[in-house]
């Protein structure tokens, strides 16, 4: 396979470089090499490289800042995937794209399915929903992985923020009325590579099960319990912290207002992905323990 990877310096893109390398020729670019909001540069890159697979984890991910920068969010998250879809269709290429739980309002009591209609609460969620919709309309061959609460050893994320604060503070208040599944960037990359490996071996690619799939680690938690788990796992991994798990106090989201509203329910049903591709999705705590050990070794 001849692959093009965007956003190589993001937390998911970083892991994808590792996971995709064994599958074939890989060209990985960052924002400096190709600004996704520069439509002509993006088209030129795709036409020059002529990939058979385009993997696009690049996105505008500043959820709160998007409320005051909607044009920037929609350029990167809305229009860029549409352009990628148009160019992929010209080449007959497969596009792999990533979406978010923030396309939902969180009012559904059960985990969200792939068939549930988006109803975002934020500009970020609106931009991601628009980009996914446009991409799927343009590119027949697409795999969109909708995920939640992404973390990793590389880049900025909730787990690393809690780890830093645990070394600085003796008490922390964290939202306890929003539920989801923390999902490691490594899991996203590994599952992507496994499915692309199946795609590579698929006898008739016209019959490959393209589409949108929920992809998140097994289990669920609140942000507060997630933070407590980060602190407890960090102590076990050998970190010297000021904060103990019991020092993480629960609060309601209403007590910690942010510019962008978040869904109360971010749970995603993953049965179709696991059944279609024969995959096991490990518990979120496994990925967290691995990342914390990795960070401790390199600190």
What is each of the regions a protein language model found here?
Residues 1-20:
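N-terminal Rossmann NAD(P)H-binding glycine-rich loop of SDR-like oxidoreductase domains
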Residues 68, 75, 79-83, 90, ...:
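Catalytic helix-loop patch of NAD(P)-dependent Rossmann-fold dehydrogenases
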Residues 282-299:
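Amphipathic terminal alpha-helices
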Residues 249-269, 283:
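Active-site loop of classical SDR/Rossmann-like NAD(P)-dependent oxidoreductases
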Residues 21-44:
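Adenosine-cofactor binding site in Rossmann-like domains, unifying the SAM/SAH pocket
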Residues 191, 198-257:
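Mid/C-terminal beta-alpha module of Rossmann-like enzyme folds, strongest
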Residues 136-194:
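NAD(P)-dependent short-chain dehydrogenase/reductase
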Residues 39-78:
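NAD(P)H-binding glycine-rich loop region in Rossmannoid oxidoreductase-like domains
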């Amino acid at each position: 396979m001849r692959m093009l990877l965007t956003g190589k310096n993001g937390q998911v893109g970083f892991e994808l470089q590792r996971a995709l390398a064994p599958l074939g020729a890989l060209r990985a670019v960052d924002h400096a090499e190709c600004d996704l909001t520069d439509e002509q540069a993006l088209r030129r890159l795709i036409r020059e490289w002529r990939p058979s697979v385009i993997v696009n984890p690049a996105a505008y991910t500043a959820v709160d800042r998007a409320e005051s920068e909607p044009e920037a969010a929609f350029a990167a998250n809305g229009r860029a995937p549409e352009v990628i879809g148009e160019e992929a269709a010209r080449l007959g290429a497969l596009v792999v794209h990533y979406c978010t739980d923030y396309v939902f309002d969180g009012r559904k009591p059960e985990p969200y399915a792939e068939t549930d209609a988006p109803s975002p609460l934020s500009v970020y969620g609106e931009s991601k929903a628009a980009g996914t919709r446009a991409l799927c309309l343009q590119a027949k061959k697409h795999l969109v992985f909708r995920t939640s609460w992404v973390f990793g050893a590389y880049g900025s994320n909730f787990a690393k923020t809690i780890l830093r604060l645990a070394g600085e503070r003796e008490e922390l208040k964290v939202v306890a009325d929003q539920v989801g599944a923390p999902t490691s960037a490594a899991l996203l990359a590994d599952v992507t590579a496994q499915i692309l490996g199946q795609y590579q071996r698929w006898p008739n690619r016209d019959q490959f099960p393209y589409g949108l799939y929920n992809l998140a680690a097994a289990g669920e938690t609140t942000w507060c319990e997630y933070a407590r788990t980060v602190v407890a796992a960090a102590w076990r991994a050998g970190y010297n912290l000021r904060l103990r798990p019991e020092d993480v106090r629960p609060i309601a989201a209403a007590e910690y207002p942010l510019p962008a509203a978040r869904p109360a329910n971010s749970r995603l049903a993953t049965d179709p992905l696991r059944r279609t591709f024969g995959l096991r999705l490990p518990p979120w705590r496994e990925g967290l323990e691995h990342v914390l050990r990795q960070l401790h070794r390199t600190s």
